[in-house]
């Protein structure tokens, strides 16, 4: 749910405050000030007598409901009786909104005291060019602004680190509007809130340097975007959402000969996929153990005909396979009591519970595959060969079964369990085999040599996009492979095919019980009516950015973990719009009580930090000890962080914004966050990452240095094989924290071990993925409460339920969105043949 406008009003009779410092005597009346908030201008209108505020009204249209909205209500109360803005305390967790309120109040009080120009006073500047910076999503945004004596002449963003095609798309339209408005009170751009706010703040700073004579007017000056003539047209397929699932569906629909319209609320295609790691889970048979040629050390990739070295196993894979081999084949028993405890991520406990009937055939087939592998591997292990020298075991059945037990979870009060729909899981696991061939045929490029891990993925099964080539031009990474390539396929298939940006779908059109189109509105208010002769595909993503919705639907997490100020890895546009539209036409929903937390969230903004758990350790800042299996599922890691998070005092000492669950990641200095645009430079990043000695790290986080050193050395001893126990067990390990050499067979040489410098990161869980959503079948028809398909309506990607149950494996999302996007488009075509 989106609250467009929050207004709080309180009269003087409600309360009065005593403050320490007063302004000069004020002229009684009503005054207004404006300052930049998180999502747009915040306006404070106050009525004053000669000494203080007697009534206050605060308006902040763009502020986040759960944070800025709550702060506005609280601060409105606090303003009555105030005569000095400095006396108003900020609201915890809403610093940006609080600061805006105080600045706007100061401007209003200055007018009342005769110390500021009237709101309608003319603008004047000291002509010249000024440089200013403001904090963006990923770092400082620097601008160069040139003023005449009365207006902005030019604005140039001279440096920034905002995400390409996500944050940086705010700059051009907002700069154009600022120049036309001669001020910064212009509309932001959906999906780029942080970046737009940084641009506004930087331009405001430049105006202040230029001696702006009327800051209030400058910050409120805007342009009115008048609606254009209403748009009404017809396509075969209308798709809502231009993220990964939507653009894949568009390309498939176009390949099938359909005309296609894609409606996207943001200023560019990409959706949440563009801010994800981008890797997808799918076993590449030529890179893993082959029962038909068990001793092979290389394999041939059928896509390029080249030979590649097979991937070696991580430490601990054999033990996991043996646990699965011993998995009970009895019907699943969900009893949870003292004798049958539930511990998220403990597959040993789940193995004795049995298996749901739908997954029994998968388990039996997998056991046969595992037994064949162990018959080959065990003699080598018995002969002293290190596990890391063996080719890794990996099959589609393993992927299916790990998706099953990785998402098998009870609700918070242990009265019900949730698990994935086996048909949907089989669909995306098996369909994952065709992702590379299909996209490569259109121009995409992938890393063919690796099957790596990322956080919470459970196995070495990840694949990374390299980019894509369109008309001889190469586009990097996710943008190239997942967006420019399918966009090119769509647009070249038919001149009528279109991507409509900055346009928000508002409702589905239903004719005689069938969904026949979409109503939408452009950023300027232009009305759009898009008719679909064959079907509508919803690919709007989830709602992890809608903290209110996450909190209200929660059935899994301790409520205290989902604080109002929790971060999110999602773009601000991921609010659950598509689910709401689908429900309005009778769609059933399920599984919304399970929201995935991403343990690798930066503390300052919730953004995805990237990385894996097999090559790092997580440390409690107070004790200096490990507290969790870092290679476990994401909910396990997040719960561990919440339960072992640092104190507010420690966070503030480190200069970190306090949120629940801040923890310390420690690794070798050579570890990187992986592909996908993450910061992999070996340098300090304030508030995020530092490089320090063990002793310096201990002093920094406030733990005992000897304890921290022992924690790391004990862990490394286990990794090197010097010790056979860990205080906190770990299923899969790739590397030591300290430096150590290996012999030609890959065995560690403990005598070369040394522990000196560390790579240290500060992170906390962020909302990341909503596993629940609209109910669908394998053809991606949207189903009603009775299980019947709603004619003409399909859905793909995170908007749907049934794929991941209570916890999603890392990398499964991208696999699922690509496979389901294609499946939905193919179903539309098949249903209309």
Identify the role of each PLM range.
Residues 523-601, 780, 820-823:
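Glycine-rich loop(s) and the adjacent beta-strand/alpha-helix scaffold that form part
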Residues 25-221:
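Active-site- and interface-proximal helix/loop "cap" or "latch" segments in soluble metabolic
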Residues 331-526, 547-548, 712, 719-755:
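Conserved redox-cofactor binding core of oxidoreductases
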Residues 255-275:
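Glycine-rich FAD pyrophosphate-binding loop
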Residues 275-320:
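N-terminal glycine-rich dinucleotide-binding loop that anchors FAD/FMN and/or NAD(P) in oxidoreductases
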